[in-house]
């Protein structure tokens, strides 16, 4: 098995975690699966040579850990929204690959706001614009797992909205 195929398998495992996250109706469970997904995508993107995507996912995993612990004093406060937004912007500048870098960078900022919100309905709504931005980056970097993840995340978010968010 080649390194590329192994990296894509890791990406598919990350896909499973990401899809599961949006089928949860509990904020901590959503974040738990996001931590797993971020960890796997960090490895996946690094292995396929998309280092910027790997670094963004690493910081996304750290963000999910902080937000998971939002009930603890050290993780409270809106400062984290600004800290992580600044981290994603700084990472985008440092790893600048041209305008394509804006897509995942903006997506990570949107998802930072998204995961700060504790209402699962709002989380799903805010995730809608984030996935298409990552799709572009995934296509350019030939991340099969990443592209499929964003496709399934969009579908999963919509299914979650139908299951939990629509009025009877």
Report the location of each language-model feature.
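Alpha-helical membrane-protein topology signature
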Residues: 1-168
């Amino acid at each position: 098995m080649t390194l590329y195929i192994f990296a894509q398998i890791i990406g598919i495992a990350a896909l499973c975690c990401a899809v599961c996250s949006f089928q949860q109706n509990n904020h901590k469970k959503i974040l738990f699966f996001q931590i797993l997904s971020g960890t796997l995508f960090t490895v996946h993107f690094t292995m396929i040579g998309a280092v910027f995507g790997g670094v963004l996912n690493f910081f996304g995993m750290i963000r999910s850990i902080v937000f998971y612990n939002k009930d603890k004093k050290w993780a409270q406060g809106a400062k984290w929204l600004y800290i992580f937004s600044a981290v994603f912007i700084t990472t985008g500048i440092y790893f600048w690959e041209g305008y394509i870098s804006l897509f995942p960078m903006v997506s990570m900022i949107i998802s930072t706001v998204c995961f700060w919100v504790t209402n699962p309905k709002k989380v799903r709504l805010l995730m809608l614009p984030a996935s298409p931005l990552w799709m572009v980056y995934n296509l350019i970097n030939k991340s099969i797992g990443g592209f499929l993840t964003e496709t399934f995340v969009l579908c999963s978010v919509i299914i979650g909205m139908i299951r939990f968010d629509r009025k009877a």
